[in-house]
């Protein structure tokens, strides 16, 4: 699977090379996430995200962008006086966000697109102990996310970006297996703040 992802990204790089002058870079940052459909709420699970990207012009002010991104998602609840329950879920993914960007000016842009992902592994624990990986609904090996964000060029090389992404399909079923209308299971809801190093 790692070879497949690398091959896909290299193909995008090759297409960009022959189609238009391309730009690229790498990035790192933090993610804050929750799982919609569980019994916990709030963007309390903090994780890491990092990767690389390429981009190229379409018709100004539009550009396309493709990333290869490692990202941690999940859910977290800290114990308190009122609630002794503790819960932590950390899910590790590789994503390939495919984005369209609209530049408002030379420094500020909006972006939106889809991001196929591959589930790598997870760790789940409560106030008692680690929860075995085979306990509860299985995680879907492949997923799809929809995302939108905003970015700002601090300098010609440094960009700060904020993006929200949401599972377009459930990342796993409800523990009960029940579904209702559009609620088909549990969904990742993630905010990612990243610092990009950009080169041309």
Stretches with model-predicted labels:
Residues 54-56, 102, 118, 152, ...:
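Residue-level signature of outer-membrane beta-barrel architecture
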Residues 30-34, 70-74, 116-120, 164-168, ...:
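Transmembrane beta-strands of outer-membrane beta-barrel pores
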Residues 23, 27, 150-159, 185-200:
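Outer-membrane beta-barrel "beta-signal"
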Residues 36-41, 76-83, 122-130, 172-178:
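Outer-membrane beta-barrel translocator domains and adjoining extracellular loop/strand segments
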Residues 19, 59-61, 105, 155, ...:
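Outer-membrane beta-barrel channels and translocator barrels
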Residues 26-28, 66-68, 98, 112, ...:
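Membrane-embedded beta-strand positions of outer-membrane beta-barrel proteins
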Residues 22, 61-64, 108-110, 156-160:
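Repeated loop/turn-to-beta-strand initiation elements of outer-membrane beta-barrel proteins
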């Amino acid at each position: 699977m790692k070879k497949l992802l690398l091959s896909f990204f290299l193909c995008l790089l090759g297409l960009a090379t022959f189609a238009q002058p391309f730009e690229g870079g790498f990035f790192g940052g933090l993610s804050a996430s929750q799982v919609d459909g569980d019994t916990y709420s709030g963007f309390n699970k903090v994780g890491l995200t990092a990767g690389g990207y390429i981009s190229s012009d379409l018709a100004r002010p539009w550009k396309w962008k493709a990333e290869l991104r490692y990202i941690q998602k999940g859910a977290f609840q800290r114990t308190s006086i009122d609630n002794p329950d503790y819960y932590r879920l950390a899910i590790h993914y590789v994503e390939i966000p495919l984005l369209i960007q609209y530049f408002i000016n030379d420094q500020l842009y909006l972006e939106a697109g889809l991001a196929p992902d591959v589930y790598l592994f997870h760790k789940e624990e409560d106030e008692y102990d680690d929860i075995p990986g085979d306990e509860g609904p299985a995680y879907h090996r492949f997923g799809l996310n929809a995302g939108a964000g905003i970015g700002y060029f601090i300098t010609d090389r440094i960009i700060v970006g904020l993006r929200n992404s949401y599972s377009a399909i459930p990342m796993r079923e409800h523990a009960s297996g029940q579904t209702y209308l559009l609620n088909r299971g549990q969904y990742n809801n993630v905010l990612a703040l990243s610092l990009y190093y950009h080169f041309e």
